[in-house]
Amino acid sequence: MIIRDSDFVFRPPPQLSWARRVLIKPCAGHTLPYPVTTSARLLDNIIRGIREISNADILIADGTPTGESIYPIYKSLGYDFHHVLMLDVRDSIFIEVENPLTQFYAVESFWVPNVVLRSDFLISVSPFKVRGDSGRFSVANLLSLLPVSKYQGEEPGGWSTLYELGIEKVLADLYFTLPFDLGVIEARQKLFYTDDDDPTKGDVEDYGRILVGEPHEADFEASQIAGVETEHLRLISEGRDQLEDQMDS
């Protein structure tokens, strides 16, 4: 679903009304504001929409690529919401979760923060970012939930061991292992940057839209808008067929 930004009011799906704990995962790994990170304005819109139908606990959680505290970044981005618990994933207990795909692409299991597993409804909220020829939307946004301490290589920080496996394959595996209920893509602006993985050096285009939907479907629509064929989304489509075959066998 694509909605004009000026008209956007977050209307949660009916199943959220049953949730006792809702986790919102923004893109908050940089101190720079939108479109590099998720805006406080959109998060506030989503929180207000949840409050309209639910008294659930609302949590916001993310982690930094350096493994340092994320709380100073939350503050710099203006993330100050009433009755919302702000969390740094590095403080979580991490539990190893098996990939449900028997023929996984790169990773057989992931270390996942327990706060995700203990939440009833999961929302990934990302900017509209395109890195080279691949979209970095709501599915790719999940990467920073993983512990840097377990996935960094010889150099401190980041998830270099996962990048070495092929990040597009890793993101497809992560989608199935960490299934989020909803993806929200903040496409008021579109940010395009090159393969050096530095979104602060990208080019920005105005677009004025918000995309909402199941994460793979919302991301696929965003990729079409961007004119790119995002590899991990293609792999997810194949993985869905594999899961159906597993269930039928």
Give residue spans per PLM region:
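N-terminal and secondary-structure boundary signal
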Residues: 1-249
